[in-house]
């Protein structure tokens, strides 16, 4: 639950869901909304896959999914799971035996697709492997691969068909006394996905994995995911998210966190509030923000920073951020700390100075948190 007593219009009441574990990461219940991505390497190339997982983890990925289409992949999975800094989800399609092999290799979670995993007998074999090896399961319904009988029944992918697919497989898991599962009903169509997820949220208390599948490239996919996921998250639906982009998985993680930051659901690192710039700017806002984004990537402590080109909105934005800089005249601007004017700084020295202030503030916050935990 995200409650703000001062600004109640920001409140989001999260849907009540069961809590499960994906490795050491809690999903559902009152756990933070976790951010996932998926590797796009050849899984049998252990080094390349691990390198990508580590880069994703470095920018905050909580969980990483890895495709396991063949035995070479599941053989490689053992070392990948052992060396990965975050839990690994094995992505399974068509071959239920790959799920069994992935569980034996150390996967924290098995993603199965109801549209191609096979009948209940095969699913029961996957359940047994998951139980024996301490894995959770994700029921991953996708509009593009629904079961044939559902397409015949409904005529096309639709929310009813997607939710029916998911609930049918929930019953199989529950009938076999397996409850460590989460579920997704993904589509590339934002309207279809949103409607299916809303219907699903009313039908089960299982943790929900949100995603808009095949969303597109970096720009188009970011926009589509922000609309689809943002809308659902605002409604309180969603326990873990994956932004699907035809781009570096690192970008998926960054976009995922930005969506959560924008809704106040989870923060990581520096949230920069900056203007688009105009003729009034007292310094080059766009170039400054680009530099600051790169130089502040290492900061994991949540905080806010406003970089505004002039005094029209600069002082007002600075009131609501931890650190602010507002452009002025004569090659200098005003630095704000905790919403109050503090001192002037030249434009030439501003970037280095802001980085120093952010690093100092991050250290103070971390020290206070450590002291409180003792």
Curated annotation (Swiss-Prot):
Highest taxon listed in the record's lineage: Bacteria
Protein's UniProt keywords contain Nucleotide-binding: no
Alphabetized SUPFAM superfamilies for the sequence: Enolase C-terminal domain-like, Nitrite and sulphite reductase 4Fe-4S domain-like
InterPro entries linked to this entry: Dihydropteroate_synth-like_sf, Enolase-like_C_sf, IspG_bac, IspG_bac-typ, NO2/SO3_Rdtase_4Fe4S_sf
EC numbers, comma separated: 1.17.7.3
Broad enzyme group: oxidoreductase
Protein name: 4-hydroxy-3-methylbut-2-en-1-yl diphosphate synthase (flavodoxin)
